Amino acid sequence: MVCWVMEFTRQTKIMTIGHLPGHTNGKVALLKANGFTDVSAILCTATSVEEIKAKLKSSPDSLFLVGGAMMNGFPDLMADLLDFIAKECPTVFVHQTVKADFDTDTTWPPTEEQVNKSALNICLRILKQAGSRQV
């Protein structure tokens, strides 16, 4: 279950980090195609840790999407970034993709399309939960 304490709308800043351009940029394209307006990708293999931290620091009240492949494939980088977020970016909400974020008919390992769709599923679920709390 996602716990979001800030307002989450289709205008909330969403950042996704990844190492494969198709997955990382594909999430951005799919989210934008579904009405999310402030979406960006961080390609960890082409962006320095300092640049990533600067982007996080300058993005309060944002959603940071982290795929399972990032946690498994880049454990030192992710440990460093998650520690940085905890200490320096208290209003950045981190969501690590889990199996429940995928459609039920997803094949394993998931295809690029299925990985990208998981990001949309996450954002739509948070949006729905945020809407259910509004009076």
Description of each model-found segment:
Residues 4-42:
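Short, charged N-terminal beta->alpha structural module
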Residues 60-61, 90:
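Proline-aspartate-enriched helix->loop->beta-strand connector
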Residues 18-23, 70-74, 100-101:
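Gly/Ser/Thr-rich loops at beta-strand to alpha-helix junctions
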Residues 63-84:
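Conserved phosphotransfer microenvironments
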Residues 82-132:
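Ser/Thr/Gly-rich flexible loops in soluble cytosolic domains mediating phosphotransfer, phosphorylation
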Residues 13, 62-63:
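Structural motif
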